[in-house]
Amino acid sequence: MALPNINQNLTDTHSAEQKTPETKQVLPSLSQDETIEQIIGGFGWSQFLQALLVSVPTLIDAQQIFISIFADAHPKWHCNLNATCSPKSNICELPKSAWYWVDSSHKTIISEWGLECASSFIMGLPASSFFLGCLIGGFTLAIFGDFWLGRRKLLYLSCLTMCLASLLTAFSVNIWMYSALRLISGFGRAPIISCSLIFLTERVGKRWRGQIGSIGFFSYAVGLMSLSAIAYLNRGSSWRKLYLYTSISSISFCIMTYFFVYESPRWLFMQGRDKEAVDVLRGIASIPVKSLDLYTSVRLNLINNLIGFIP
């Protein structure tokens, strides 16, 4: 019986090993959004605080939209005891001596400036001016924000413009000045809701976007309720105080957004400001950047040429 040629078998095995192609580890193909998603992770305390900060402007926005319900309202009036009139009478057909305002004559702009018999154009001018400002601001400020200002500065400037205009509204001397300032206020508030929602969804991973987005709407509801509470406490007083109370406190919150809110990392990447984008991701990430897996770290370097920036 012939014995197998051991040397020949070893030679064949060695040749087969040489012909076997090398196995290479291939990094998974990740888009820039997927890379950012992996870095941001889930939901942490830093992201929660950022969500609260960017939700405050929606609270202020709700107050400034609906403040006219109280400031521009028709106050109640009564007939004088010695006058021949009834509550169902047309106030415009009665002499001034036949009736009086129930509360202070400075409670609303109607009673202070004697607009009870003004035309429908004059009566609707403040509200129309406000929403005209919203229309103009929606077109112009969005362009400035995407190309030059950035989303953080846009949110800050929009909120500050709205609040400063609201503060100046308290010192209006007539309906024309009042309407002009309402137009500026509407111009400033136009991009606030969209900016806040974008910031909210960018701060967390996809799993939490539905829950975190509701914070903005909750803040908006709080703004409505707080405005009603302020108006109730201010009942009988001048409408000017209502603008002062809502604007002075709001200006401080607007300033906080400039110093404590991070810029959008996606916008920074689009502008080529890669190092700043990585610093932002490091600040808002729910997991330490050092503990990122190999694929995510390498992919971020390949996409944005950031080798040397990530520790």
Task: Identify the residue ranges that each predicted region occupies.
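Hydrophobic transmembrane alpha-helices of multi-pass solute transporters/permeases
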Residues: 2-94, 111-142, 146, 151-155, ...
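Helix-breaking motifs and short loop linkers at transmembrane-helix boundaries and internal kinks
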Residues: 149-150, 171-176, 188, 205
